[in-house]
């Protein structure tokens, strides 16, 4: 496979889709989403060939490992898929990310959100993260199931709640890190206002102090013996300077826009203009963001846990942006979306150069 050529295709698709949505979203004229079906096709292509991330090669190595030992080291659900497809890696990605995209499309439809705005913000802000990480399947399943909790079906309401519960807890089997979101989920049903937001911030500070001073010192000596403890080591997050710049360019727009949304929607109480179910997703976004910040300021040497939790935000974040479109300043949305778009291109360009010199990170 010609990896640099695939990266060029990634760049072309990401830019074409982003610009297709960006100009109408922030122009004077709205556009019907005549490219709706084609957009999903291109999103699937990005998921199949997301060579801009080292995870694409990591999962392929897991498949090779499975062929030798009938065990991939991934969650059992992926071993079940690998057992059926007999080592065809692209087919594996087609099944996993195809189901994830289908769940995502169904979620958008259930919430009755404008498809053009929803896809536009998801493409600009979230697709590059969604396309490379296997947690995307679990995230799609969790947020899809959660939609039955906040917007149950009119008929057979109990069945809807039950189905949503099954989906939410099944998501954990797709990626163990989703336990974090499941634990946060009950708190999303508590309305978020200024005093409560400050209370949550204080709770994060207290938890941070307890973790850093009372918990982490006692478990630190055992980390090297535990599965998955590469998340806690500084070496696991060793990055060249160029990658640090790319990471900053990708994350900075999110931090800026989150601060603005907290001011507009929490401090100025504009979230009241959201429907009840959208308010729940907004609280979810805030809780995920605060959790990621807590991990960032913890004494854990690696930032892997921080950014893994942070990147779980993009599905509900796109939902919130599409609904906040008529509530907050479009100029701020445009500026931050442009920054996110440029950050995405920096990421793709860095990966392209990495493929050319054989040092993809």
What are these regions (language model features)?
Residues 1-42:
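Start-transfer (signal-anchor) and selected internal transmembrane alpha helices
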Residues 34, 105-124:
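Transmembrane-helix signature of polytopic, membrane-embedded enzymes
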Residues 34, 52-79, 182-313, 351, ...:
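Alpha-helical transmembrane segments and terminal signal-anchor/GPI-anchor hydrophobic tails
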Residues 94-110:
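Transmembrane-helix motifs of polytopic, lipid-linked glycan transferases
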Residues 115-132, 136-145, 177:
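Membrane-embedded helix bundles of polyisoprenyl
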Residues 125-128, 161-187:
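Membrane-interface alpha helices of multi-pass inner-membrane proteins
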Residues 142-160:
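Membrane-interface transmembrane helices that cradle and orient dolichyl/undecaprenyl
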Residues 199-203, 329-347:
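Signature aromatic-anchored transmembrane alpha helix within multi-pass, membrane-resident enzymes
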